[in-house]
Design a protein with these regions (language model features):
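Short, structured segments at the rim of ligand-binding sites
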Residues: 1-428
Length: 428
């Protein structure tokens, strides 16, 4: 990865034509790391993502007694068999929501207290709904932070299991966290969704897929509940991690913006990653999408043809919102993105950040409690603030492919999920 300056000017260019190697999925890497750390014996994970978020998960799991040997993107994890140790110091989840929440649930299996903390923004991201669900399954935990946010002290001693209700309207990570630890409960776990509501369901389906790959007995129990057999420990496996669909959103969006063509190899034909749903949105806006031989190719509209504006519910693919918001700058009318309230509790308040930075580039943008409306205007270059949010940096860099004078402030924050992003962008 090239050392990045504090402010990086993006060079406009014509239609791109590129084959882009997208790094491994962060979501899958962190789920597989945790399952492998809980399993007995050695698991081999191929295609892992090395990033700030996965380093945070790895560091926490090492402190809990697992070991990880890295050989490029192939990691060998020696698991604990569910017998976690009590770390000597609080665990640092950094700015990783998946790490803080998944590890908080797993820490119930330790024999003594475990404190999970993180970066300042992590202390503003909710965890109370997860803690309440864990308590409903017999765990003991104390929230040490303000307003239901970390740090959290999990007292350990195991997870009894049984039945609990969880409020998953703000984050699906709460559900995934409970599920990932559930095979080590003393009896089977049933998790009921409060009011049947679940944001970003595809991420829970992804969790179930990873758990089954490690031998868990888990799944949906009707439309509003999930179950996991227990005690039913994971088994050690060799597991292949596919490319990150959330990361692939940026080269796909680049093809749309420049009227070019991008091919991303490595996706399974039956991939269930949430952000691949962006492909259908881009098709409706006038792009052509083709799948063949394990690759996905997106071609933007021909020169002289504008992208079509769209009104779209993105609840199931929230991480793709930022890329689409920048694509909307080049549409033929106003685009509205709906049902994305949980963007306000991500690495930053993404709805507020998008509204501000889209306006900075000349768009007429307005954000509501769970929606964003983008009306293209006379576009102009400007420095773009990134709010220490990797997706803000990666998305707004795409605007610079068409708009002269776009400068990304703190581009290094992209290392959270794609450390080599700006090197890749320069090569497209």
């Amino acid at each position: 990865m090239t050392h990045l300056p504090a402010r990086l000017a993006i060079r406009p260019r014509g239609p791109i034509d590129a084959v882009v190697a997208v790094p491994g999925s962060k979501s899958i890497t962190n789920r597989a790391l945790l399952a492998a750390a809980l399993a007995p014996g050695e698991s081999v994970l191929e295609g892992c993502l090395e990033s700030d978020d996965t380093a945070a998960m790895r560091g926490c799991l090492l402190a809990l007694g697992a070991s990880v040997a890295q050989d490029a993107d192939c990691w060998t994890v020696r698991g604990t068999g569910g017998r976690l140790r009590v770390p000597a110091a609080p665990l640092d989840a950094r700015a990783s929501g998946t790490t803080a929440r998944f590890v908080a649930a797993a820490a119930t299996l330790a024999p003594g207290p475990v404190v999970i903390d993180g970066a300042p923004r992590m202390r503003e991201r909710p965890i109370a709904d997860l803690v309440r669900a864990l308590e409903g399954l017999g765990a003991r935990a104390q929230i040490l932070g303000r307003d239901g946010c970390p740090p959290v002290r999990v007292l350990g001693g195991g997870l009894a299991g049984g039945e609990a209700t969880i409020d998953a309207r703000r984050s699906s990570q709460f559900v995934s966290a409970v599920l990932l630890a559930a095979p080590y409960a003393r009896r089977p776990v049933t998790l009921r969704l409060e009011d049947g509501a679940l944001v970003s369901r595809p991420y829970v389906d992804l969790t179930l897929q990873v758990m089954r790959a490690f031998g868990a007995d888990c799944g949906w129990h009707g439309a509003g509940a999930l179950h996991a057999g227990a005690p039913h420990p994971y088994t050690s496996v060799r597991y292949r991690i596919e490319p990150d669909a959330s990361a692939a959103a940026y080269p796909f969006a680049a093809a749309a913006i420049t009227g070019g063509r991008v091919r991303v190899p490595g996706f399974a034909a039956d991939s269930i990653q949430a952000d691949l749903a962006l492909l259908g949105v881009l098709e409706k806006m006038g792009c052509r999408v083709e799948r063949s031989a394990g690759a996905i190719e997106v071609t933007g509209p021909a020169p002289g043809r504008a992208l079509r504006a769209i009104d779209v519910d993105m609840n199931a693919m929230p991480d793709a919102v930022l890329a689409l918001a920048v694509v909307a700058l080049f549409a033929d009318g106003p685009t509205t993105i709906r049902n994305v309230a949980n963007l306000r509790i991500k690495e930053t308040d993404r709805l507020a950040a998008l509204e501000c930075e889209l306006r900075r580039l000349g768009a007429r943008a307005e954000a509501g409690s769970d929606w964003l409306r983008i009306e293209p205007g006379p576009l102009r270059g400007a420095p773009v603030e990134t709010y220490d949010d990797h997706r803000m940096a990666m998305a707004f860099a795409l605007a610079g492919l068409r708009i002269p004078g776009v400068v990304i402030v703190d581009p290094g924050c992209a290392a959270k999920t794609w450390p080599g992003y700006f090197d890749a962008l320069a090569s497209w």
